[in-house]
């Protein structure tokens, strides 16, 4: 038996708003410890990891481990129907993921589980020399600023500043943030702006983004709940461009 109840529908909605933009299907692993998933997009550019601990939920029961395959677009269609004050109840039964919203009325949705063989990807083991924090909204605003001129973004970090910049045909943009962290080795890398915009759809998950950056290395972006009961993280491959 699996059943999970949550008073805040935004946690699931904001998580899967980002996830559904990256991957079409996911395998959700259910256990006594909580809910987690690991997925890689078809182009092998973006890796996503979600972990919601059992303690996050107002009620949580999982008698035995279970793996369910879900179409993320169909799941997101349902989660978008949640109202701000709804209580969300998740359960599984006879090949369905059942989602109930309890508010002014009780609304029940059944999403058919996908019967496919799914190989859960393992996260690549990457060692970073740099880690720093940036306010999530500042990062999101920076992406919107860069989007005016370019479809790619350069991230740089040195001992004082985190810099997001772009050079476009019709103009340039640069945003600087004093991170206040200890950075031993400056780093620079270029990424797809659209891919980062997909990740930042999870704008209600955390107020802070943790960034790991290296020269021409994948970007690691981690969002952690203040309660430490949930984590959403991404790895994004860099754009390697030939020097002119």
Swiss-Prot record:
One of its GO terms (biological process) is regulation of DNA replication. GO terms for molecular function: DNA binding; DNA polymerase processivity factor activity. Signal peptide: none annotated. InterPro entries: DNA_clamp_sf (IPR046938), Pr_cel_nuc_antig (IPR000730), Pr_cel_nuc_antig_CS (IPR022659), Pr_cel_nuc_antig_N (IPR022648). The keyword Ion transport does not apply. The keyword DNA-binding applies. Homotrimer. The subunits circularize to form a toroid; DNA passes through its center. Replication factor C (RFC) is required to load the toroid on the DNA. Belongs to the PCNA family. PANTHER family: PROLIFERATING CELL NUCLEAR ANTIGEN (PTHR11352:SF0). Sliding clamp subunit that acts as a moving platform for DNA processing. Responsible for tethering the catalytic subunit of DNA polymerase to DNA during high-speed replication. In conjunction with replication factor C (RFC) stimulates DNA synthesis by PolB, relieving inhibition by replication protein A (RPA). NCBIfam families: pcna, PRK01115.1-5. This is DNA polymerase sliding clamp.
């Amino acid at each position: 038996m699996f059943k999970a109840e949550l008073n805040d529908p935004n946690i699931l909605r904001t998580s899967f708003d980002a996830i559904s933009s990256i991957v079409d299907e996911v395998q959700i692993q259910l256990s006594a410890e909580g809910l987690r998933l690991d997925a890689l997009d078809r182009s092998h550019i973006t890796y996503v990891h979600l972990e919601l601990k059992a303690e996050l939920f107002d009620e949580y029961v999982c008698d035995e481990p279970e793996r369910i395959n879900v179409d993320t677009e169909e799941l997101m269609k349902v989660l978008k129907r949640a109202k701000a004050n709804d209580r969300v109840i998740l359960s599984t039964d006879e090949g369905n993921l059942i989602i109930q919203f309890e508010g002014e009325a009780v609304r029940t949705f059944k999403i058919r589980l996908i019967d496919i063989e799914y190989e859960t990807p393992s996260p690549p083991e990457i060692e970073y020399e740099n880690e720093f924090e940036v306010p999530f909204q500042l990062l999101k605003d920076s992406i919107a600023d860069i989007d005016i001129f370019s479809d790619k973004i350069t991230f740089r970090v040195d001992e004082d500043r985190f810099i997001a910049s772009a050079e476009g045909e019709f103009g340039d943009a640069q945003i600087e943030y004093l991170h206040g962290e200890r950075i031993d080795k400056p780093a620079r890398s270029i990424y797809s702006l659209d891919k980062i915009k997909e990740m930042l759809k999870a704008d209600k998950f955390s107020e802070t983004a943790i960034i790991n950056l290296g020269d021409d290395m994948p970007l690691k972006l981690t969002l952690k709940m203040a309660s430490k009961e949930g984590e959403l993280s991404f790895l994004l491959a860099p754009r390697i461009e030939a020097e002119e």
